[in-house]
Amino acid sequence: VVESRGEIFTIPADKGDVRNLTASSGAAEREPAWSPDGKFVSYFSDVSGEYRLVVEAQDGLTPPREIALDKPTRYYTPAWSPDSTKLLYTDTNLNVWVMDVVSGTAKIVGRDPWMVPSRTLAPSWSPDSRWVAFATRLDTMYRAIVVANADTGQRRQITDGLADAMYPVWD
């Protein structure tokens, strides 16, 4: 799945036709993500005037589902949980969100309190879909890695904060 000129396309790896999932002139669809089970594509769309999260069956046989997002802002980096039940994304206000795809309920599981250049949260899912790891800036201006429970939002800093720690990856 790719984004080009505000449209979302699926392109087969081997044979088949390129398909425009959005075909929405005058709107901007961006940041597509394919679910790990291969059944769904998600992306952000402003066709309604405010950005919404769209979840669409990759086969295009059912209408896309638009999910209203909490606050008018810009959203980034959608990532499906490994079990394809949740989406992780960030926003302009440096919040880390987890959304249950079935219910459309989203909650903030973390944030970076400092609006500074090179602000990156770099969230990532644990292989069992239970935890989210991300970088957050401390009062010292170093970044630390925090893990948050995807269901409860309970957080724990796992690096000491004595040096920058960024881009968490799970083993």
Language model features with spans:
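Surface-exposed loop/turn positions within WD40 beta-propeller blades
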Residues: R5-G6, K15, E50, N93, ...
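Alpha-solenoid helical-repeat scaffolds
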Residues: V1-N20, A28, S42-Y43, G49-Y51
